[in-house]
Amino acid sequence: MVKAVSSSKGAAKVEQKKSAARSGVKKNASKSQASLQDTSSPLKTSSKNAHAKKDVQAKGAVGEIKQVIGAVVDVQFEGALPNILNALETENLGNRLVLEVAQHLGENTVRTIAMDTTDGLTRGQKVFDTETQICVPVGEATLGRIMNVIGEPVDNVGPIATTKTRSIHQKAPEYVDQSTASEILVTGIKVVDLLAPYSKGGKVGLFGGAGVGKTVLIMELINNIAKAHGGYSVFAGVGERTREGNDLYYEMIESRVNVNPKDNNGSTKGSKCALVYGQMNEPPGARARVALSGLTIAESFRDEGQDVLFFVDNIFRFTQAGAEVSALLGRIPSAVGYQPTLATDMGALQERITSTKTGSITSVQAIYVPADDLTDPAPATSFAHLDATTVLSRSIAEKGIYPAVDPLDSFSRMLDPLVVGEEHYTVACQVQTILQRYRSLQDIIAILGMDELSEEDKLLVGRARKIERFLSQPFHVAETFTGSPGKLVPLEETIKGFKGLCAGDYDDLPEAAFYMVGSIDEALEKGKRLIAEAAS
C-alpha cells in the first residue's frame, strides 16, 4: 500500500489526490479483511483492533507526509488541521503506525511524534486523522494481557475482548471528587506496614539496585493486594528491558497472579494484573506515553470502585523520553538538558494518581538516580510527589534477610499518630531507635567484640538482631525458591509481635526462631522446637 499511495505524489490536481486517497482506503480495507483471517502473528493480531476503526478514519481529514526526521513526522493538510494530541494513522511496511499531533506549524502543517519506528515512511504518503486521541482498551478484559502504548496486544493471544476504550489523556479528578481521608493500605508485608506504611491513593518511590529483590517485592505487592483486597494491578514498563518484561510476565503466571492463556483455552479470566510495555528499543514517543496508557487502565478500575495498585518501572525513563521528544520538537532545553516542561509533564502524570470517593490508585514507582545525585532535576521533580519511600539495601540482602528493605532509610508520611494510631507509632519509633543504636554500636563490636559492651547494650544488640530477623518474611511468589509457604501478616499481628520484642518478652528465644516467619506465634512455635532440638 505504501508504494500505491506514494505513487500518487506526482498528481497535481486536487481531484486526483482525492481519488488516490479513496482508492488507498479501499485497498487498506481489503488488506484488513485478509489479515483478520490470520492470527498466528502478534502484529497481525494487533491489526484487528486497528482495522476495526477504518470507517472512522475515512471520515477524518486526509493529509500528506512532507518531512520525516527520526521520530518526528510533519504532515500537511488541505483544510482544517487536526487538534493537538489527535491520533493520526498511516501504514508503514504493512503495519499500522500511529502519529500524535504535537505542534501546529505554518502552511497547514502539523508536527507529530511517531509511536513506532518511522523506517519505511516516504514523502507524499497519505495520513488519516482519526478525529480522536490515542485510546486504549480498558476493563477486566485487559487483565493478564500485554499491550503496547496504543493498546494493541503484543502477547500473541489474539485481540482484547472488549469494546470499551478510553483516551490516554485524561484530566485529574476534580477537587470535589477527591477523597481527603488518610487510610493505610495494608500490604501484609511486616516491614512496610510497620515502618513505612503505604496510603490508599499514595505514591511510593521504590529504590533498589540489581539483585536485591525489587522485582520479587513488586510481585508480592501485586499478589497481596489482589488476595487481601480483591483489587487489580497495572504494570507499566517505561523504557524497560525486553528480557525483564518477559521474565515478569512468566513469573506472574508461575506465581498464579495471572492465568496462562495456553492452559485456559486462550482466556486470561481470573488474572489480576494488566501489563503495558514501552520497551527500551522503542521510539521516545512510545516511552513518553506508555505510562499514561497504563494509568488510563488503572483509572478505569478506580472509577469502577476498585483499589488499584499501579507500578511504573522506571519513572526516570519517562522523564528521559520526554526530554528526547522535547529536543526533537526543537524546544530549548532547561537545566542539565531536560525539557523546559519537566515539572508540568511530571505533574500531569502524578496528579492523576489519586483517590476518589469511589476507589483509589496506589502507585509504586521505581526511580533511578543518575550518578547518585539526588539534586538531579529528574529525581528531584519526582520526590516532590512521593508520600513514602521504600529503600532496598544490598547490605541487608547479603545477610539473607528478605525483603531487603532498609528500616532506617525508608520513610512514610503516613507514620503519624493521628493516622496510624498511638500504639502503632510508638512501636515503630521503638523499633527504629533500637536499630539505630545497634547500627552505631557495630563499629565497636567489629573492633573490640561483644564482650566490651555494657550489659544494657548487649541486651539491646540481642533484641536488635531478633528484630532484624523478624523483619524478614517468606513471600508467596518466592515459594518455589525458598521452599517455605508465603505469609500474609495482618497489621495487628505485626504490631503485637514487635511490641513484645521491644519490651523484651522474647529475650529467651534464639535469634533463628524469628527468621523467615510470619506472625509472632509462628516464631514462638519455631523457638520452642529449636530449644527442644538443642536439648535433645
From Swiss-Prot:
Q: What is its EC number?
A: 7.1.2.2
- Function of the molecule: Produces ATP from ADP in the presence of a proton gradient across the membrane. The catalytic sites are hosted primarily by the beta subunits.
Record text on subunit structure and interactions? F-type ATPases have 2 components, CF(1) - the catalytic core - and CF(0) - the membrane proton channel. CF(1) has five subunits: alpha(3), beta(3), gamma(1), delta(1), epsilon(1). CF(0) has three main subunits: a(1), b(2) and c(9-12). The alpha and beta chains form an alternating ring which encloses part of the gamma chain. CF(1) is attached to CF(0) by a central stalk formed by the gamma and epsilon chains, while a peripheral stalk is formed by the delta and b chains.
Q: SUPFAM superfamilies attached here?
A: C-terminal domain of alpha and beta subunits of F1 ATP synthase, N-terminal domain of alpha and beta subunits of F1 ATP synthase, P-loop containing nucleoside triphosphate hydrolases
EC primary class: translocase
User: Which superkingdom?
Assistant: Bacteria
**HAMAP family linked:** ATP_synth_beta_bact
| Major localisation | membrane
Which reactions is this enzyme annotated as catalysing? Answer: ATP + H2O + 4 H(+)(in) = ADP + phosphate + 5 H(+)(out)
Q: What is this protein called?
A: ATP synthase subunit beta
Q: Where is this region: Disordered?
A: 1-57
GO cellular component terms, semicolon-separated: plasma membrane; proton-transporting ATP synthase complex
